[in-house]
Amino acid sequence: MKNKILIILFTLLFSKIALAENVNIQAKKISIDKKEETTIFENEVRIVDDQNNIIKSDYAKYNKKLNFFTFKKNIILEDSKGNIFKSDNASYDKNNGLFKTLGKSSIVSSEGYIVETENVSLDLINNIASSKNLTKIIDLEKNTIDLDNFEYLSKENIFKSIGKINVKDKIGNKYEFSQIYLDEKQREIIGTDAKAFLNQKEFKLDERNKPRVFSNAVSIKGGQTKFIKSAFTLCDYREKDKCPPWELRAKEMKHDSKKKTV
């Protein structure tokens, strides 16, 4: 039948670990180059590996010698943890369990966090995804997190990053950090070397006020923000970052965005 989906079962032998593993491949079109030991799959390609990772694409090329896949166009990888990765160019080093995207990529985590980034490296053995490129994450509380890079530990449901980090919540409060942890299960953001710029009018005695909190660490969870070893001021910015005329210091300070209190 012309449109019949071809199903091919490859038994792949790994010399390093001396195990035989199966990969199921489906496609509507297939061509084989025996000399080069490569196989090309096109149209509705679907691959399921031994770890139940599912890869779909318009095009896939398999190199038998290297045990290596190359993918193009409309690539969707759903890993065994339920995370979904999308890109238009990717590769899969089956021997090392390493899946890589090239160019613009997106992720929807198993907990519903949305990630926009580039050049993702996914270790399917250790369940770790990472990118050294600029990244935007939107969490379930509609916080937008802009990062220089990220690492995602999918077993622990934790994102982490070190570098220039900016967070903006749904009511316009802005935070700057040098290091951040996003705990998906707890729906919590933890950051260090924090600067918080509060947007709520209730904190302003005058339109010129710039309510802000600087602290060693911050925890943001469920509409409440906890500042550790912090300083709070309403005063306007001063030239050359001089200290404000007054500030309130505390070992612990809390900001409730719903009650609009500090």
Indicate residue ranges for each PLM-predicted region.
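Sec-dependent N-terminal signal peptides
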Residues: 4-14
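Structural signature for solvent-exposed beta-strand/loop edge elements and short helix-capping sites
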Residues: 20-262
